[in-house]
Design a protein with these regions (language model features):
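A short, well-ordered alpha-helix in the C-terminal region of glycosyltransferases
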Residues: 184-199, 208
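Carbohydrate-associated surface elements
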Residues: 3, 22
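Short, structured helix-loop element that forms part of the nucleotide-activated donor/catalytic region
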Residues: 6, 73-99, 110
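Conserved acidic donor-binding segment of nucleotide-sugar-dependent glycosyltransferases
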Residues: 161-169, 177-183
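Short alpha-helical donor nucleotide-sugar binding micro-motif in glycosyltransferases
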Residues: 105-106, 113-118
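Short hydrophobic beta-strand element within catalytic cores of glycosyltransferases
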Residues: 143-146
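Aromatic "clamp/platform" in nucleotide-sugar-dependent glycosyltransferases that forms part
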Residues: 126
Length: 217
């Protein structure tokens, strides 16, 4: 990310070249597997998809969502990268809200279906590098809700909903506003894919990488 590039300059006085992750427009899928497994349908759930680790802000998300008045579900998809202790903490926090679903690790068509049919994709992280999951979510045409850390905000610019990091109340209010205002969500959905696929086009990333190798032969 640009933040990492700045860190190397400030800490080690090293000049670096920033080449971001890339993404292409994704093919949308009907909710077949996720309908059978979790009773999920188009636009009836909010999605977090990523590793279940503390720095991703999932605790804030659960705490905020439990205060939101909505029939929509919260789907937390992904596995833990270390022990299952944190995952169990999350499940304990969520156990009194039947709207919250943990899917575990997902891949393939199930992952595609989750991205394709979410009402909102959210990444409430305290710490990120270059969040590929955010690029992927926008490539599926999702309205995204992210924390205001630079690594997320600089990716989405003004094309997503943003809340103050670590602020459960602000996250709750932003979630509630999104659930109450489908027209706002649809606006972001309609612009997401074109914006992100133009800004982080894989062909451009490949060209920049090849150019760098040629210069340094």
């Amino acid at each position: 990310s640009k933040g990492v590039q700045d860190y190397f300059k400030e800490t080690y006085d090293r000049d670096t070249i920033f080449i971001p992750n890339g993404v292409n427009k994704s093919i949308l899928r009907e909710p077949n597997i996720i309908k059978q497994k979790y009773d999920l349908e188009k636009d009836n759930y909010i999605l977090y998809l990523g590793r279940l680790v503390p720095e991703k802000g999932i605790k804030y998300l659960i705490e905020a969502f439990k205060q939101v008045k909505t029939d929509k579900k919260l789907v937390i998809a992904g596995g833990s990268s270390d022990t299952d202790t944190f995952t169990q903490e999350l499940k304990e926090l969520a156990k009194d809200d039947p709207r919250i679903i943990f899917t575990g690790f997902v891949q393939g068509q199930e992952l595609d279906e989750l991205y394709s049919n979410a009402y909102i994709y959210t990444l409430p992280s305290d710490l990120e590098g270059m969040p590929l999951s955010l690029l992927e979510a926008m490539s599926y045409g999702n309205c995204c809700l992210v924390s205001d850390i630079d690594e997320c905000a600089s990716v989405v610019e003004d094309n997503a909903l943003i809340f103050r990091k670590s602020d459960v109340i602000d996250l709750r209010n932003t979630l509630q506003k999104a659930c109450d205002t489908p027209s706002l969500v649809e606006k972001y959905k309609s612009e997401a894919s074109v914006f992100i696929c133009d800004k982080y086009n894989w062909d451009d990333v490949v060209d920049k990488t090849l150019e760098l190798y040629e210069v340094n032969k």
